[in-house]
UniProtKB/Swiss-Prot annotation:
Residues spanning the membrane: 9-26, 41-61
Name of this protein: T-cell leukemia translocation-altered gene protein
GO cellular component, one term: membrane
Keywords, comma-separated and alphabetical: Acetylation, Chromosomal rearrangement, Glycoprotein, Membrane, Proto-oncogene, Transmembrane, Transmembrane helix
Record keyword Membrane present: yes
Extracellular side: 2-8, 62-103
Linked pathology: A chromosomal aberration involving TCTA is associated with T-cell acute lymphoblastic leukemia (T-ALL). Translocation t(1;3)(p34;p21).
Modified residues annotated as N-acetylalanine in this record: 2
The encoding gene: TCTA
Function of the molecule: May be required for cellular fusion during osteoclastogenesis.
Species whose genome carries this gene: Homo sapiens
An annotated GO BP: negative regulation of osteoclast differentiation
UniProt main location, coarse: membrane
Membrane topology listed for this record: Multi-pass membrane protein
Length: 103
């Protein structure tokens, strides 16, 4: 008789634990509709992550931009110092006409 009582207690344990999380969660668990719960949790995670990124960018955005943006005559990311970028093959003679796509 004690075995049947402990078996019933073990079967009721998940319902008791899930009931502590909330009655709605318990109803969904009992209905075996965990897809809805998983979707809600993933959606909540996505929203919280995006809010965290937005908040962090608000605090540290200028610092990050300052690390990667170096104004000057170099390349777009400022990696070439003092305008030493020189590509003579890209230059054209002053008297040479501009070429169009059809040529």
């Amino acid at each position: 008789m004690a075995e049947s009582w402990s078996g019933q207690a073990l079967q009721a344990l998940p319902a008791t634990v899930l009931g502590a999380l909330g009655s709605e969660f318990l109803r969904e668990w009992e209905a075996q509709d965990m897809r809805v719960t998983l979707f809600k949790l993933l959606l909540l995670w996505l929203v919280l992550s995006l809010l965290g990124i937005q908040l962090a960018w608000g605090f540290y955005g200028n610092t990050v931009t300052g690390l990667y943006h170096r104004p000057g005559l170099g390349g777009q990311n400022g990696s070439t110092p003092d305008g030493s970028t020189h590509f003579p093959s890209w230059e054209m003679a002053a008297n040479e006409p501009l070429k169009t796509h059809r040529e």
